[in-house]
Amino acid sequence: MMGETPNSSKVPRLEASMARSQYRGSEVSLDTIPYSGIWPRIKKISRETPVQISFWLYGTFLSGAITSGRKDSNGLNKSRTRLEDIFKVKREPVSVFLLATIFNYVFFFCFHQLNLVVNGVRLN
């Protein structure tokens, strides 16, 4: 027993495209199948369903000191933290307050170490 006979035959896409190009008037190739033999099968060829390729690109292309961020890799999918996530701390008012406080400490420390007089008052 050989099994069931298929209801339809599928023609490879390469042969179908060669027959179409030959029909348009291009050069006859030795590899092509004659027009009369392939055309009835081309009309009833089953279409291949296109695969939907979707991906998210959360890339940050930065150089210099701002190239930090976590890298997540899962198989072939690699993503990097978004720009909003990297700079999230800098947008919060608490971090601005801390930065100003540190600047004040450094400023007064420098004046104290150098024993500078500001407006007639010694800062020590």
Swiss-Prot record:
The keyword Transmembrane helix applies. Its main location: membrane. Partially overlaps SEC61. Keywords: Membrane, Transmembrane, Transmembrane helix. It is a single-pass membrane protein. One of its GO terms (cellular component) is membrane. This is Putative uncharacterized protein YLR379W. It is found in: Membrane. The chain crosses the membrane at residues 94-114. It comes from Saccharomyces cerevisiae (strain ATCC 204508 / S288c).
